[in-house]
Amino acid sequence: MHRGGDRSTDPSSGPAPGSRGGGDGRFGRGPSRWSSGGGGGGSGSPPHRFSRGGGGGGGDGGGGGGGGGRFHPYRGPSDHSGGGGYRSGGGGEYGEPGSGPRHRYGSGRGDHSDHDNRNNYVKLFIGSVPRTATEDDVRPLFEEHGDVVEVALIKDRKTGEQQGCCFVKYATSEEAERAIRALHNQYTLPGAMGPIQVRYADGERERHGAIEHKLFVASLNKQATAKEIEEIFAPYGHVEDVYIMKDGMRQSRGCGFVKFSSREPALAAMSALSGNYVMRGCEQPLIIRFADPKRPRPGESRGGPAFGGPGFSPRSDAALVIRPTANLDEPRGRHMPPDSWHPSSPRSAPHQFNNFGSDNPMAPKGSTVTSTTDTATFRPQMFSGNGSLSSQTAVPSSSHMGMNPPPMAQGHHLGGQQIPPLQKLPGLPQNFPVQLQNNQQGQPLQGPAQQIGQLQVPQSMGPGSFGQNMLSGQLPVSQPLMQQNASVGAVQAPSAVSNSMQAIPGQQHLPSNVAPQMLQQPVQQMPSQAPQLLLQQQAALQSSYQSSQQAIYQLQQQLQLMQQQQQSNLNHQQPTQGQPVQSSNPGAPNAIIPSNINTIPQQATSPAVPLTCNWTEHTSPEGFKYYYNSITRESKWDKPEEYVLYEQQQQQQQQQKLLLLQQHQQKLAMQQLQSPPQAQTHPAMQPVQQIPQAQQGQQQMQMKQQELNYTQLQTPGAIDPSRIQQGIQSAQERAWKS
């Protein structure tokens, strides 16, 4: 086709001096970015933005001006008048240039003055356009189906490179519909990897009052093709389009859109298939809702003068994605790219929610689904309307929180008070001391601190208390180990540690009887300050439990070694002192302490729980965990109680194995460090009458025994204090890290 115009112009209708009027379409493009011809008019007359014809004045009628342009079959006869078959510009009904009123977008467009109103055009998005394509490659293809007002190739603002897509403006919606039906997924431009996608651009259907009967379909098989999906919905009516949503790796998300020609077949398909039809290879039935048209977010403009700014979208309601904010009810965000076109910087995030819940094809059946005829809402049961966790819903376990937390849960409401996520205690039912778990099952806590041979274990004992005493080389021995009233047999060190409350900032100690009451109260009925206080105490107990338990075992081992050394030293001192030494008491700890160690694993036991569990833990493609029952085929977001008890039993078994291993190691160490046999058999040879005399000299022996406690650690054959300190430090470090 001839692009040039007739260069002959009528002087009477020519442009005013200084204007850009006149010339043909090739050299007169100055006034408009997209025009292919010069706009006419006087010096003050703005040229038509979309004009392709040349010519002088701003009129629409025929004249003698040179008119650049091209022929296509959808223009009326008036478009071809003048200039030997080419579109005319020139004077027209408004008279000579510079006189009379001027039309805002006047140009040589023949009788299509209604097309010049930029509010009447219809904008289409074209995907899978080669990055090397030009306007001349795109325009002729679309002009075969209607009057193309404008073609705009989208380029990157920084680099200037094309983004592989463009926009095409048609004069009427009928022409746009005709182009969509003829070209969508049916024509491949030269150099493209696949067929082009032709769809309405953002908000075009709503702007022109058109209604799309489109369904959103979730729980699709990720290997299913558009043809297979169409076959499922075809029995209910004519399917115009099937769109499968894909991620950045070009893999199906398990959801998509099915477009019907009318509302009745769409409603029939939704009623028959939603919640009933299960695709081959899937475990969950299809979830079908009417697609909710995208609404722009507040503060986001739809674009600049021609086609909109950088926030353009390939389709009007392609993805219905909500950005990860704290409120699930705020307007929808931008869309996902189409299935065959991806921009250089994908906007899709790995964890996003649409208004039907997460893009999870394995959405559990237990989820609550509520819908209307126009919009649909699908949220897991654990989320309330405002994005906060429901008060009747269990907090996800630490294994769930180990990943990125759900983006919509910025804070958790606990008893009417919002607690930040950082103060939330992860994994409390699993890692809390065994004694507190038993207390919840009906066993009372034992509050007072116990004494290991008058070796006091303070109630606020934690990692710091052991470190301050042991690292300084001072053993916390307040009374002699030889006293007869030492309650060694009643040792319950883990219980004392679990009941002890770590000192809160400000050195606020709680009585031992307060802890069970606070732990047994429902979380919703706590005072306003109690939740934070309890969380801090529980966190301190968790961190100190492991280190305290290891330190107690080390102290018991040191106690046995010191008793054995005291026996050997007392045997050497008997000839010099001239009076017998009590012999029955020193042997008592040797028989009691091993029994204490044997009772510790028994305390760690809990009521029997079945070793098998029908619930299993799984992770959805979005990273959220759910639980599936292999017997009832039920899925839940919340962790079932049976699974919680099963995990607790597994952890208790691991703790028992650890305690047995430590006990075995201690026995081996004791066998290696035991004194000669006469040190154990000698007390039985002492007469009974010597016991009162030994009690009379008890005060003298106390001072000597305390000296031995501090000096015998440095004697040959004793434990090196540096090794003790290193062991305690390593135990504390492991406890803090865990």
UniProtKB/Swiss-Prot annotation:
Stretches with biased composition (Low complexity): 368-377, 435-451, 683-706
Stretches with biased composition (Basic and acidic residues): 109-118
A GO BP annotation: flower development
Ranges of residues in domain RRM: 122-203, 213-293
Chain spans, region Disordered: 1-118, 292-451, 566-595, 670-738
Subcellular location: Nucleus
Family matches, as Pfam families: RRM_1, WW
Biased composition annotated in UniProt, kind: Polar residues: 342-358, 383-401, 575-595, 723-732
GO cellular component, one term: nucleus
Source taxon at top rank: Eukaryota
Record keywords, A-Z: Developmental protein, Differentiation, Flowering, Nucleus, Repeat, RNA-binding
Compositional bias annotation for Gly residues: 52-70, 81-98, 301-311
InterPro entries, per the entry: Hud_Sxl_RNA (IPR002343), Nucleotide-bd_a/b_plait_sf (IPR012677), RBD_domain_sf (IPR035979), RRM_dom (IPR000504), WW_dom (IPR001202), WW_dom_sf (IPR036020)
WW domain mapped to chain residues: 609-642
One MF term in the entry's GO annotations: RNA binding
Subunit structure: Interacts with FY. Binds to SF1, FIK, RPRD1B, OsI_31983 and MADS8.
Job of this protein: Plays a major role in the promotion of the transition of the vegetative meristem to reproductive development. Required for RNA-mediated chromatin silencing of a range of loci in the genome. Cotranscriptionally recognizes aberrant RNA and marks it for silencing. Controls alternative cleavage and polyadenylation on pre-mRNAs and antisense RNAs. Regulates flowering time, seed size and cell volume, probably via the modulation of cell size.
Protein name (database record): Flowering time control protein FCA
Biological source species: Oryza sativa subsp. indica (Rice)
Encoding gene, per UniProt annotation: FCA
